[in-house]
C-alpha cells in the first residue's frame, strides 16, 4: 500500500485472467477515511491499513464503498476486521454475493468529501463514480479501465447490452473538473486525466 496522491493510498492484486491489476484505494481526510473496491490484501497491507484507518487511528474507517456489483472483492474480510459498513449504489444491491449494510443513490454525499453519481447503460445498472472536488480526483470501477499507461479503454463490447450507448453515458464525466482519474482495473492517470477522457470519448 503506497500513497499515490496526498491522502490517497493504493494497493493492487494482479489478475492473471485479465492481465491487469485490480486496484483498491484508501482515502484519508480530516479525521476520517474510506476504502474503495478493496482487492486482496496481505497481512502487511492489513497492518498498514490498521495504522492509517483503524479505530484508534487519527482517521477511523467510515465506510467501504463499492463502485459496482462486481467489485465486492475483499470487502467482507475488511468489514469483519474494521467493523465498517459496506455501501453500494441502490441499483446494484440485489446482485451482490454478500450483503451491503447501506445503499447510496445518484448525487449522494459520502464520507471524505466524496460525491457519487451513476452512469447509464453500463455493465451493471448501478455503476458509479466517486468524485472528490477539493482534490480534483475522480474514482471509477468498470466505467473505464487502463490497459495502457496514459490511455483509457472500456470493457469488451460483449460486457454491455449496447456498447455505443455505454460510451455515450461516459460523457457525464466531462461535467466535472478533475486532474486525476483512479481506475479499478489497470493503470490510473494522475495528471491531465480529464483530457485523456476527452481523447477516448472522441475516438
Where are each of the predicted segments found?
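Short, compositionally biased "basic patch" segments
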Residues: 1-28
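Amphipathic coiled-coil/heptad-repeat helices and related helical stalk/stem segments
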Residues: 20, 45, 71, 165-166
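Short glycine-/acidic-enriched loop or helix-start segments at secondary-structure transitions
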Residues: 45-46, 74-76, 97-98, 149-150, ...
